[in-house]
Amino acid sequence: MLPVHTEVKPNPLQDANLCSRLFFWWLNPLFKAGHKRRLEEDDMFSVLPEDRSKHLGEELQGYWDKEVLRAKKDARKPSLTKAIVKCYWKSYLILGIFTLIEETTRVVQPIFLGKIIDYFEKYDSDDSAALHTAYGYAAVLSLCTLILAILHHLYFYHVQCAGMRIRVAMCHMIYRKALRLSNSAMGKTTTGQIVNLLSNDVNKFDQVTIFLHFLWAGPLQAIGVTILLWVEIGISCLAGLAILVILLPLQSCIGKLFSSLRSKTAAFTDARIRTMNEVITGMRIIKMYAWEKSFADLITNLRKKEISKILGSSYLRGMNMASFFIANKVILFVTFTTYVLLGNKITASHVFVAMTLYGAVRLTVTLFFPSAIERVSEAVVSVRRIKNFLLLDELPERKAQEPSDGKAIVHVQDFTAFWDKALDTPTLQGLSFTARPGELLAVVGPVGAGKSSLLSAVLGELPPTSGLVSVHGRIAYVSQQPWVFSGTVRSNILFGRKYEKERYEKVIKACALKKDFQLLEDGDRLVIGDRGARLSGGQKARVNLATAVYQDADIYLLDDPLSAVDAEVGKHLFQLCICQTLHEKITILVTHQLQYLKAASHILILKDGEMVQKGTYTEFLKSGVDFGSLLKKENEEAEPSPVPGTPTLRNRTFSEASIWSQQSSRPSLKDGVPDAQDAENTQAAQPEESRSEGRIGFKAYKNYFSAGASWFFIIFLVLLNLMGQVFYVLQDWWLSHWANRQGALNDTKNANGNVTGTLDLSWYLGIYTGLTAVTVLFGIARSLLVFYVLVNASQTLHNRMFESILKAPVLFFDRNPIGRILNRFSKDIGHMDDLLPLTFLDFIQTLLLVVSVIAVAAAVIPWILIPLVPLSIIFVVLRRYFLETSRDVKRLESTTRSPVFSHLSSSLQGLWTIRAYKAEERCQELFDAHQDLHSEAWFLFLTTSRWFAVRLDAICAVFVIVVAFGSLVLAKTLDAGQVGLALSYSLTLMGMFQWSVRQSAEVENMMISVERVIEYTDLEKEAPWECRKRPPPGWPHEGVIVFDNVNFTYSLDGPLVLKHLTALIKSREKVGIVGRTGAGKSSLISALFRLSEPEGKIWIDKILTTEIGLHDLRKKMSIIPQEPVLFTGTMRKNLDPFNEHSDEELWKALEEVQLKEAIEDLPGKMDTELAESGSNFSVGQRQLVCLARAILKKNRILIIDEATANVDPRTDELIQQKIREKFAQCTVLTIAHRLNTIIDSDKIMVLDSGRLREYDEPYVLLQNPESLFYKMVQQLGKGEAAALTETAKQVYFRRNYPDIAFSSPAVMSTSNGQPSALTIFETAL
């Protein structure tokens, strides 16, 4: 497995001094680098030792394990929260001290503001002592401001690090658990859900730690402020506080509603992402079946449900944001209305001290406190989901029992087990067998007999209900569907072992990979993507086998590895790899290829989970039991022993000498013809995930907003926002004006000594009330409308992206790993649904506030503009400097996140393999390495934003200091109201300004998600689904296919995989297509289905395929694909997604493929929901479902792509027989590795290196000893070749000379005087 990240820079924080830590100076070199060039992974600092994934995960896991034990003792449910608290409470509690100091400073600040305003109210130009005292107050005010600037960011940095630690530890635990899940537990969860835990749920820890301390700091601060307000304005302060108190339960109600909506949303999101995962995985099949519309409807419906919940929760959020915006105004309004009505006179110092005090407590009470409640309630939901996952059943730990006497053994006795306890019939019943070193145990039986389950029992994946399995020795396992992980081919084969050249070369040779490595562009250094996207099926199977052989285990469990390769390679693998390289091992081989049974030490026949027969090949022949009939029906002739009397290898009939002689002497396809690159799947290499550079363009914003609403509506929204802000400021200005008038009136009163008149209270109060009401209305309206537009935009863009994905050519899915495409649908759409609208609204509100603060300050004290100019310049330069680096850091964070998910989903796909090789530890290390890489990026993301914020707040602090001291210098020309307004406004600027700038950067960062989604909305499209030129209704009547000089490549820059192919396939002809792995067989089908556009012409019944719509073309051909795909949903949906058939037709189709009973046994019959990707059916059964689909479609052209590779001979025969009956009137093309399935075809097409080498009747080709087809048949061994030639001859004469009675001489071959179980097959089409 590849190292994740090569070079590591030491973390400068470890050696930083106190000043450097306070102001984040240690980051300066990084910013310099970011200013000069684009940052890469090598620029990131290594993770601090205490933040390493392994350390954090194991620490928390320890606490969780203790908690589980304690809960068991106390007979209660374990609590994950308890484990988290016990693990982290000390370090987190210390951070509370920061909160305490910071909030105290916030509360004390207004007192000094009041003293300065007081000085202006009692202004006396001769009193120098008062002036000096005022300067003292200004200094203390400035000091408070500086303390806040530094402390706030230190606190935030530390709590976010705490959040990161919990998240990383959780991910480590989730992955560790995923590797240990029992199979019954895997049934209860899906890959999608586990990925969702890792992509969404754990992120809640990052957010909850930030606000948690405010749960106690909020109420404390409120008490402090109340006391100060009481001193300042007496009992009327209670009126204002009453509003605050009313707001709290209102907000917690909103919070509760919000969290219930969130958990519903999460369920819908899970379902959508799960379905999306399957759609992307099965895209090739969906395209060939032309099922896009059905899946589009499915996803659209899921998305509609999800969006309705998201809109609901967004409106609640909108109300919350609005209440934050207007709370202050309402509180001040109520307070001063009460104050005035109680007969008090308004003064500037009262107004602005109260305003600032309320401002201090308002942030905490209306934002941090409710956020804490909301985040805690979200975190509780997430912790519950994670806890439920962590409590799922695990596989019992199996000790790898080393053989005591050095002898490996597999012993199974009376073994009975169920995959699903709900079903009445056990999966395996009463199995008993023993296998010892040097034995090859072959397991055969029809589809669904329990062959793979038998291997899983030996692996320990299927726990026994009764009976016993004892395994001594190390196991290697090769799964039926090959599993490879992202990395090079070599790292897949080594699978964590040391590279030993000699052993490696031997393994490569035994697994027939040598030739492939010469042809692959980078040999075994080729990097294969997710699910081995760049290897053909046969290559993947051989790489898997090579992995097993290289491990040098004692016991080999091989689940039908020979079915994915052609006969010649299969023979090579069997002789060289299974019989020779593994001859001293215990080998249990599940196979459908009966010709190899002769070499087996024992044969085990399974049917319906029970062992029908067990014995050696010769015993079966002697006793003539049922196996004989099974063989008669299905055996493809077993190879006769090379020379009687040659020394045998552990009684396998191939001797070493004969194998080597065969190797060197036989004329082979491999020697004869230079083989082209394995062109089947050498699509273009997996490109790096694109990281767009530089600014987010205006175009992205334009597309985003126009997706949400019409331009007319957007202009209206802008005006609404501006008007709201104007009224917001007017309300404060009116209060200041009122205080000034009142002050002037008092002064006159004092000067004259008699009352000259009072202010008209109703006039001032009336206007004040009006302004407040309008502010509230505008505040709420703009909040809700912004959310409406942005959620709508997310919905529109999701639909466009999904539509674009459905219309993208297959190449796109081969080039991009599932994780990368899914990331857009989960992470990026998640951002657009949830965080972007919230951040955007927040940004607009704070930006407008900042602008109004500066405007008011400048209107009152024009000279403020003088220091503003240099401060603004510094700010602009700083922001640009910061964004150069922060953008790169954010993108690095996104791109280092993908591998974490890819590694998880890849591990889940190869779970059995990983466990069989005991590679959990190694996978866990790799996962931790991926996590650490992501933590490096995340750590930089946190610290760089703090670096910027500290500097911004410093600019604001300078602004406050200038205003405070400046107003004292100009004391003569100012009155108290003006100073109060300017100073109190500039104090609110402190947190507000840096928050608005950070939110602007945040919006820009989140717009990357929008950009990534928009990038997928205009992918290259395949041809249109429907064209104006529609084929006639019953087309094709005949099913004649003409290839006219066809060249085919998967991508413009890729190699040609079909070259100058010209062929005519007549109506109702059955054509077999053969050739080595990678000869271009599957590409021929891709060209026919136009999965990529072919050059040259392909005609079907005189209609040029490139002239009609893709759906018109694809719907008219049926395909039984190589890898059968079922989708989550009902069996009915899987057979007939468009509801075009009646129940009766569906049951009839199922009956014809002998699945009716299996489906009737399900609890909901045809409406039973299938497990993810139909994993509750065996591969063979899934293949039969594909056949049922083809039967239902009743098309004139049927294509079979190695469909019977994974099924037993009986099912194979069933499929062949159904194809003969049902598709007699159709044109059938069959790609086959088993030559017996196509020997009775009308024609055989032999492809090699993308060229059509031979095309004629099988018998005609077999008459020419130089033909490739002849050589292929001869490689099966003399007897088998004779039998096939005989069949071909009969078919030939029956077809061409029907009048001549043709009887075949019995073919009888004896080996050692024993009649071999040789029969002629009436199989295939």
Swiss-Prot record:
Domain of life, per lineage: Eukaryota
Pfam families (alphabetical): ABC_membrane (PF00664), ABC_tran (PF00005)
Keywords: ATP-binding, Cell membrane, Lipid transport, Membrane, Nucleotide-binding, Translocase, Transmembrane, Transmembrane helix, Transport
Feature: compositional bias, Polar residues: 658-667
Region (Disordered): 658-691
Catalyzed reaction equations: ATP + H2O + xenobioticSide 1 = ADP + phosphate + xenobioticSide 2; an S-substituted glutathione(in) + ATP + H2O = an S-substituted glutathione(out) + ADP + phosphate + H(+); 17beta-estradiol 17-O-(beta-D-glucuronate)(in) + ATP + H2O = 17beta-estradiol 17-O-(beta-D-glucuronate)(out) + ADP + phosphate + H(+); dehydroepiandrosterone 3-sulfate(in) + ATP + H2O = dehydroepiandrosterone 3-sulfate(out) + ADP + phosphate + H(+)
One GO-annotated biological process of the protein: response to tetrachloromethane
Required cofactor(s): Mg(2+)
Tissue expression: Ubiquitous with high levels in kidney.
Domain ABC transporter positions: 410-633, 1041-1274
E.C. number: 7.6.2.-, 7.6.2.2, 7.6.2.3
InterPro entries per the UniProt record, alphabetical: AAA+_ATPase, ABC1_TM_dom, ABC1_TM_sf, ABC_transporter-like_ATP-bd, ABC_transporter-like_CS, ABC_transporter_C-like, ABCC4_TMD1, ABCC4_TMD2
Organism listed in the record: Rattus norvegicus (Rat)
Protein role: ATP-dependent transporter of the ATP-binding cassette (ABC) family that actively extrudes physiological compounds and xenobiotics from cells. Transports a range of endogenous molecules that have a key role in cellular communication and signaling, including cyclic nucleotides such as cyclic AMP (cAMP) and cyclic GMP (cGMP), bile acids, steroid conjugates, urate, and prostaglandins. Also mediates the ATP-dependent efflux of glutathione conjugates such as leukotriene C4 (LTC4) and leukotriene B4 (LTB4).
Designated name of the protein: ATP-binding cassette subfamily C member 4
GO MF annotation terms: ABC-type bile acid transporter activity; ABC-type glutathione S-conjugate transporter activity; ABC-type xenobiotic transporter activity; ATP binding; ATP hydrolysis activity; ATPase-coupled transmembrane transporter activity; efflux transmembrane transporter activity; glutathione transmembrane transporter activity
Subunit relationships: Interacts (via PDZ-binding motif) with SNX27 (via PDZ domain); this interaction accelerates MRP4 internalization.
Enzyme class: translocase
Location relative to the cell: Basolateral cell membrane; Apical cell membrane
Record: residues binding ATP: 445-452, 1075-1082
ABC transmembrane type-1 domain sequence ranges: 93-377, 715-1005
Regions crossing the membrane: 93-113, 136-156, 205-225, 227-247, 322-342, 351-371, 710-730, 761-781, 836-856, 858-878, 954-974, 977-997
Topology with respect to the bilayer: Multi-pass membrane protein
GO cellular component, one term: apical plasma membrane
Main localization, broad class: membrane
